[in-house]
Amino acid sequence: MLPAANRMRRSDEFARTFRRGTRRGTRRLVVHAATTDAGEPPRVGFVVSKAVGGAVVRNRVKRRLRAVLMHRVTDLLPGTLVVVRALPPSANATSAELERDVDGSLTSLGLRAKVVPAR
């Protein structure tokens, strides 16, 4: 489970990330990122709309994305806000595909404090 200190919950954090941040996307997802005070821990949020599928499918996608980010939140720079927005093709994606997409987006945004070796 993603630690409570690393979860984004407030709508103003989501709005700030979407408005002021940068983004990188793939066929399955878009990663939005913004920075805040360096003293704060990195925080992550997820957006999975009804366009992705029904409730069961959306929750499965969210679980997979949370699992991917749970292991990467320690690699993020302090003060980073990250929102992962799932697109409809993510409904049929495997965990490995989502992992590759998230890793590629985080790396291209330059958000990692340390690089995780590819599997």
Swiss-Prot record:
Keywords: Endonuclease, Hydrolase, Nuclease, RNA-binding, tRNA processing
Catalytic activity from the UniProt record: Endonucleolytic cleavage of RNA, removing 5'-extranucleotides from tRNA precursor
Matches recorded under PROSITE patterns: RIBONUCLEASE_P
Biological process annotations from GO: tRNA 5'-leader removal
Enzyme class: hydrolase
InterPro entries hit by this protein: Ribosomal_Su5_D2-typ_SF, Ribsml_uS5_D2-typ_fold_subgr, RNase_P, RNase_P_CS
Annotated GO MF terms: 3'-tRNA processing endoribonuclease activity; ribonuclease P activity; tRNA binding
GO CC list: ribonuclease P complex
EC id: 3.1.26.5
Function text: RNaseP catalyzes the removal of the 5'-leader sequence from pre-tRNA to produce the mature 5'-terminus. It can also cleave other RNA substrates such as 4.5S RNA. The protein component plays an auxiliary but essential role in vivo by binding to the 5'-leader sequence and broadening the substrate specificity of the ribozyme.
Assembly and oligomerization: Consists of a catalytic RNA component (M1 or rnpB) and a protein subunit.
Similarity section: Belongs to the RnpA family.
Protein name: Ribonuclease P protein component
Gene name of this polypeptide: rnpA
